Amino acid sequence: LPICPSGSVNCQVSLGELFDRAVKLSHYIHFLSSEMFNEFDERYAQGRGFITKAVNGCHNASLTTPEDKEQAQQIHHEDLLNLVLGVLRSWNDPLLHLVTEVQRIKEAPDTILWKAVEIEEQNKRLLEGMEKIVGRVQPGDTGNEVYSRWSGLPSLQLADEDSRLFAFYNLLHCGRRDSHKIDNYLKLLKCRLIHDSNC
């Protein structure tokens, strides 16, 4: 989210504009995550029974996230903002390694690689934008809460192809799930903070 031209002084973008950009970006990331997961699923996961093994296996499962809009509405906006930061930060390492490791998958299509690179870049932009938003809403607080560390790199490098493909499948499955949650939380936060919940 390049908010102001470089070198500009006293450049101030409204909180509403920051949220508009964040919501658009999160929607785009979720779209890419879904496309990449579906493409991987069709190409590599058919008939392997991955979906039955993938339930609740995400690296950031320790971050308690509301499951639906009703639950999210019960959470104070400051806590929800910090939760969004925590989830976004928990994806820094996995996305970085996904870009590298996906190139080693046999006959990996360029479209999957391109989406991995794009999601990694856009996640960084969204995180920067969210840090700006948090700085405005909660001055002095950049949400430095503990977030889930990722230790899944060895599983993306396993010699056994089935196990390795399942590790990719699971990571992409979690990415799609989390990007959907972030998208929903940001829409809710925008409604609450910008439109005084009149949405």
Swiss-Prot record:
One Gene Ontology biological process: positive regulation of cell population proliferation
Entry similarity comment: Belongs to the somatotropin/prolactin family.
Organism: Alligator mississippiensis (American alligator)
Cellular compartment(s): Secreted
A GO cellular component entry from the record: extracellular space
Residue stretches in coiled coil: none
Disulfide bonds: C4-C11, C58-C174, C191-C199
Gene Ontology terms for molecular function: hormone activity
Glycosylation sites: N60
Descriptive protein name: Prolactin-1
SUPFAM superfamilies: 4-helical cytokines (SSF47266)
Post-translational modification: Glycosylated.
Keywords: Disulfide bond, Glycoprotein, Hormone, Secreted
Broad class of the protein's primary localization: secreted
Pfam family, one: Hormone_1
PROSITE patterns: SOMATOTROPIN_1 (PS00266)
